[in-house]
Amino acid sequence: MAGTTGERPFSDIITSVRYWVIHSITIPALFIAGWLFVSTGLAYDVFGTPRPNEYYSQVRQELPIISDRLEGKQQINEFLKEVK
């Protein structure tokens, strides 16, 4: 016969009023905090990703695609010269 770990059964936890009082506040708060984190642009600053209007410069409006694998380094260097 299996022993007990002494922990409360999951069904007891999710049917308790205390669980729902705590989670009815924390779950919406986490959602709102995440939404604000992204909508204010702080996520772009924290993770260092470019904002949607910063992906391409005014000079270069296309993707820098490497077309020849043997001359890839040369193509990358040409792309970097254009960016500067």
From Swiss-Prot:
GO cellular component terms listed in the entry, alphabetical order: photosystem II reaction center; plasma membrane-derived thylakoid membrane
HAMAP family per record: PSII_PsbE
The UniProt record lists the keyword Transmembrane: yes
GO biological process, any: photosynthetic electron transport chain
Organism of origin: Cyanothece sp. (strain PCC 7425 / ATCC 29141)
Membrane topology reported for the UniProt record: Single-pass membrane protein
Family that this chain belongs to: Belongs to the PsbE/PsbF family.
Disulfide bridge map: none
Protein name according to UniProt: Cytochrome b559 subunit alpha
MF terms (GO), sorted A to Z: electron transfer activity; heme binding; iron ion binding
Top-level division of the source organism's lineage: Bacteria
Cofactor note: With its partner (PsbF) binds heme. PSII binds additional chlorophylls, carotenoids and specific lipids.
Compartment annotation: Cellular thylakoid membrane
Residues binding heme, per UniProt: H23
Keyword Electron transport: yes
Upper lineage: Bacteria, Bacillati, Cyanobacteriota, Cyanophyceae, Gomontiellales
Subunit comment: Heterodimer of an alpha subunit and a beta subunit. PSII is composed of 1 copy each of membrane proteins PsbA, PsbB, PsbC, PsbD, PsbE, PsbF, PsbH, PsbI, PsbJ, PsbK, PsbL, PsbM, PsbT, PsbX, PsbY, PsbZ, Psb30/Ycf12, peripheral proteins PsbO, CyanoQ (PsbQ), PsbU, PsbV and a large number of cofactors. It forms dimeric complexes.
Alphabetic keyword roster: Electron transport, Heme, Iron, Membrane, Metal-binding, Photosynthesis, Photosystem II, Thylakoid, Transmembrane, Transmembrane helix, Transport
Obligatory cofactor(s): heme b
Described function: This b-type cytochrome is tightly associated with the reaction center of photosystem II (PSII). PSII is a light-driven water:plastoquinone oxidoreductase that uses light energy to abstract electrons from H(2)O, generating O(2) and a proton gradient subsequently used for ATP formation. It consists of a core antenna complex that captures photons, and an electron transfer chain that converts photonic excitation into a charge separation.
Gene from which this protein is expressed: psbE
Membrane-crossing segments per the record: 21-35
